[in-house]
């Protein structure tokens, strides 16, 4: 048997991406410019949304959405306890109060009954998280916010465009996923995407913010607000300022610096051309995994249901009957066998930052249960079928051996 060294999630970069980046480097325009604008245009077409704002991360996108909505001190924003810190840290960045809700017994989604109970007169935003690219139940989410509409008091111009709690999707994992045929981006009120190096679609670092069509929103005005917040509060971006005779500008608010560059956008343009094929390969790998684990103690999350077609960003599994210690030992044994694996994620209340804010893991038992025996396997387009089969065989064998030895 060959010696394997299977990485967890390397980027899939071809000569197409390299050529696009080289073209940008030769053009003399490497910061925010024509290629960033073209990527925004094409992403809007792909997600079926009015406008897209490309930024330097999904975290920046999520924070700017909250700032555009003027969420701040005295407001509450609800997030699931099972997510990465970025879903929650942005709430503290704007001065609002994070409210965590436990997940359901059989999935990563928020417990919608608990969500309903957590809503108060202070609740301004709910942030559902599309973990692994699997879209949450938006029918239920919108039912909850409609039911609680009477508790909501709009405190800003854009909040008045909704006159209810705003749903802001953390779709860091979900570019290309659909819910009832609708693409991620056009489902929630606002959506943030990640284009980090480990994502299905990458610009090395990067992300975007978008929103679904709403007759109460002037899309050009909304886009302009994001642009201003992303570039120091400046009324002109670099491309506009560089036009002959167009140096004049103003700073209308002491804002931030989180714009995307044309070098990053160049990667994205080439990736978007290849994205349908990349998604198909991920589907083939997930299908192969699913067949291989059928009838074993390895239980993966479902990436395809009656309502959801996932972009299959992560292959999240649970090892039936494994304790935390056994799970960790399985990960070590996989590493010895040349297989990189991961855990998604530590629940927020386990992290020092959120313990210091007063959150207690004991209040979120389902999130802990999800974490306790979870292992994420390699899922990327450079995997061969032979490597997938090796991962299946090794994972099942190692799991059985470790659980048998502890009995």
Regions found by a protein language model. Give the residues of each.
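N-terminal "arm"/small-domain region of PLP-dependent enzymes with the aminotransferase-like
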Residues: 1-29, 34, 250-252, 378
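PLP-dependent aminotransferase class I/II
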Residues: 37-41, 49-50, 125-129, 134, ...
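Structural detector of well-ordered beta-strand residues that form the stable sheet scaffold
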Residues: 53, 78, 99, 166-168, ...
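PLP-dependent aminotransferase-like
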Residues: 67-171, 178
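Hydrophobic/aromatic ligand-binding patch that stacks against planar heteroaromatic rings
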Residues: 89-91, 183, 263
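Conserved active-site segment immediately N-terminal to the catalytic lysine
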Residues: 155-202, 224, 247-251, 299
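Active-site PLP attachment segment
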Residues: 173, 186-236, 262
